[in-house]
Amino acid sequence: MSRLRRIIAVWAAKATGFACRITGKQGVTLAGQIALKIDPDILKELSGQVKEKIFVTCGTNGKTTTNNLLCSAIEAEGKKVVCNHTGSNMLNGVAAAFAQNASLSGNLKADYACIEVDEASTVRIFPHFKPDYMVLTNLFRDQLDRYGEIDITMNLLKKAMEWYR
């Protein structure tokens, strides 16, 4: 049953992404939201199919640029990479990146994954997969409206890293 759910979730994510693009929207997070509703384990299942390593990029500034540079460097070596290029870096966006890179049979043929993750979303994303490497660009106080003090952001990252134990 879980394989069937994964296949349906992948199809739904791809169809949602396509429909949003033809109507002039990105639709990345909506595609991920729908995929997770159909198969709550889709991120765990697809990320487990990455052959080599999973890189996660976090930080206040420069996440998208750093993540996309890392992805480009790996692709230049002829490797297949799952990447959330658009910076959709919360749970739905990350799920969409994996689902939209999967085949219609619900399988992922990727050597690496380069995933940008919002600092506060690490605690929601890391239970689904454990990255092999984390690139932390920086932590600044420019998002006080979202996270309060920088210590709160740092504690969120520490809590997320407890999943490694």
List each language-model region with its residue ranges.
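Phosphate-binding loop of NTP-binding sites
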Residues: 4-165
